[in-house]
């Protein structure tokens, strides 16, 4: 056809105009199909998110009040390679999270142990990612997922497996703005110093901030470990003493007058009568021995109205107290101490390796050096060592903090031990009920025990003669009437006896070489702190 271009398609001749018309129609049809597919895909995603909506969310109070049949939670500490492939349910705090592409990496923390959890959008939907992403740090969550091998070794968690999350629920939301971040509170001093050198100064959480917000502070791995170690010290203490025939007792903490006749007591009104909080179970321990209990111990609170605001003084602490009948000589008490504490130290090493490692990560320290046979020096020998080192000390006075530290260094250098005993102390620096040394009344049948150059306990043989006891009480300025029931206990016959007392917090502080006793007191009470 002249003036007209003819095309052939499938044997049919069509004009160019008709071809364009058909192409436009086809393109319109394709666009319609794309729109339908997009709509279908969108509906599919909505349906998917709708179907996944039961896999995440906040748990209601009613749900928390109801029992869940067959529910079993796995501790984060038990998430190990041996259970890779298993589906587990775990609970913990949201330590932190990080979004990388379509994957949300969540670090979950439980009692100082951490695990990486992976939430993938392709598996759980965008809405679940959004839900998890907006949860604030320290919120309590539960999740269900499969234990898997990570693609690369993990360095930011305690567990070397990861959880591929299927479901996650929030049991309790934390406030978004925290007074301290647990991650900051868990940072070691060396890491803080290193960050400064690298030009990225990390936050340092100060002691008062920690103690004012103790409920957050004790969530750090090191603090979790410290109080687990403390628990094991008590267990080992009880275990050893019970194996030696000791009976655990509980003495009153409300008493008339003053505990040991000292001024450092918390006085109070007791129904119109003057009273105080016991600064020692000493008197009642002795009365128990007079009641033929022979060997007793107590784990309980002790109150001291200390004015000292130092790294090692508290106004309330846990006392580990022992009293025992003496069969032959007061050295029997020292023999007991010399066996008891190495037993405790050994048990802690055996039972708390993970906890000790957690403490070391934040507060590096070397294991305590002690001898199989506990070193025992006289007070005079200790004074002589200090004098030979050029220290000026009173031969009949008590050792101050600096003298204790110096003597600890000298003992470590000479005897290769950080745990030792110093006995036969001057009578002038001992309580009124301490038995004088038979060969020289300037000294007494008493001793102190030291760890890493600091005194942790005092012990002695007690005076069991009522006349001598009255005499010593008057010499110390004590009103005998206020302790008459105590003295009367010895008028009915009393066996020779003695004992010792030690602060649990101080033992743990020195065992872990910590620089402040407040780190080993759950909610410390000192001369300036009564809360939280």
UniProtKB/Swiss-Prot annotation:
Catalytic activity field: tRNA(Asp) + L-aspartate + ATP = L-aspartyl-tRNA(Asp) + AMP + diphosphate
Region (Disordered): 31-58
InterPro entries: Aa-tRNA-synt_II (IPR004364), aa-tRNA-synth_II (IPR006195), aa-tRNA-synth_II/BPL/LPL (IPR045864), Asp-tRNA_synthase_2 (IPR004523), Asp/Asn-tRNA-synth_IIb (IPR002312), NA-bd_OB-fold (IPR012340), NA-bd_OB_tRNA (IPR004365)
One Pfam family of this chain: tRNA_anti-codon
Enzyme class: ligase
GO MF annotations, alphabetized: aspartate-tRNA ligase activity; ATP binding; DNA binding; metal ion binding
Name listed for the protein in its UniProt record: Aspartate--tRNA ligase 1, cytoplasmic
DNA-binding interval(s): 88-169
Keyword ATP-binding listed: yes
Compartments it resides in: Cytoplasm, Cytosol
Coiled-coil intervals: 7-41
Family in the record: Belongs to the class-II aminoacyl-tRNA synthetase family. Type 2 subfamily.
A single BP term in Gene Ontology: aspartyl-tRNA aminoacylation
Residues that, per the record, bind L-aspartate: 260, 304, 458, 462
């Amino acid at each position: 056809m002249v003036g007209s271009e003819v095309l052939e398609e499938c044997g049919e001749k069509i004009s160019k105009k008709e071809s364009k018309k058909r192409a436009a129609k086809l393109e319109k049809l394709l666009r319609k199909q794309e729109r339908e597919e997009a709509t279908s895909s969108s509906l599919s995603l909505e349906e998917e998110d709708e179907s996944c909506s039961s896999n995440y969310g906040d748990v209601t109070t009613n749900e928390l009040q109801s029992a869940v049949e067959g529910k079993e939670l796995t501790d984060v500490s038990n998430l190990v390679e041996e259970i890779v492939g298993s589906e587990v349910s775990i609970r913990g705090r949201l330590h932190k999270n990080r979004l990388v592409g379509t994957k949300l990496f969540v670090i979950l923390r439980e009692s100082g142990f951490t695990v990486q959890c992976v939430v993938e959008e392709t598996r759980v939907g965008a809405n679940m990612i959004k839900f998890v992403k907006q949860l604030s740090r320290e919120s309590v969550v539960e999740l269900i997922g499969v234990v898997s091998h990570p693609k690369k070794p993990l360095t930011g968690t305690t567990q070397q497996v990861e959880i591929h999350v299927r479901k996650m629920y929030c049991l309790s939301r934390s406030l978004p703005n925290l007074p301290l971040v647990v991650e900051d509170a868990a940072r070691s001093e060396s890491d803080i110093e290193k960050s400064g050198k690298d030009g990225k100064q990390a936050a340092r959480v100060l002691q008062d901030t920690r103690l004012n917000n103790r409920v957050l502070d004790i969530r750090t791995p090191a603090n979790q470990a410290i109080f687990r170690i403390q628990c094991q010290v008590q267990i080992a203490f009880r275990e050893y003493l019970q194996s030696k025939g000791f009976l655990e007792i509980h003495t009153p903490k409300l008493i008339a007058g003053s505990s040991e006749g000292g001024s450092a007591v918390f006085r109070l009104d007791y129904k119109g009568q003057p009273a105080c909080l016991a600064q020692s179970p000493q008197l009642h321990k002795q009365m128990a021995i007079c009641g033929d209990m022979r060997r007793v111990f107590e784990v309980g609170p002790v109150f001291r109205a200390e004015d000292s605001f130092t790294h090692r003084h508290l106004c309330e602490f846990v006392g580990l107290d022992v009293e025992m009948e003496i069969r032959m000589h007061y050295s029997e008490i020292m023999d007991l101490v010399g066996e008891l504490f190495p037993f405790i130290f050994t048990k802690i090493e055996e039972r708390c390796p993970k906890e000790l490692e957690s403490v070391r990560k934040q507060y590096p320290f070397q294991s305590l050096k002690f001898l199989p046979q506990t070193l025992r020096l006289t007070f005079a020998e200790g004074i002589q060592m200090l004098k030979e080192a050029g220290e000026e000390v009173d031969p009949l006075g008590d050792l101050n903090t600096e003298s204790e530290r110096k003597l600890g260094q000298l003992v470590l250098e000479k005897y290769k031990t950080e745990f030792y005993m110093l006995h036969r102390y001057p009578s002038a620096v001992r309580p009124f009920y301490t038995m004088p040394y038979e060969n020289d009344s300037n000294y007494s049948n008493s001793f102190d025990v030291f760890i890493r150059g600091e005194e942790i306990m005092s012990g002695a043989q007690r005076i069991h003669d009522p006349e001598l006891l009255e005499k010593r009480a008057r010499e110390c300025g004590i009103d005998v009437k206020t302790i008459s029931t105590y003295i009367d206990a010895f008028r009915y016959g009393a066996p020779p006896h003695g004992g010792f007392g030690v602060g649990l917090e101080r033992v743990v502080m020195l065992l872990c070489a910590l620089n402040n006793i407040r780190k080993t007191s759950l909610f410390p009470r000192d001369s300036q702190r009564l809360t939280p």
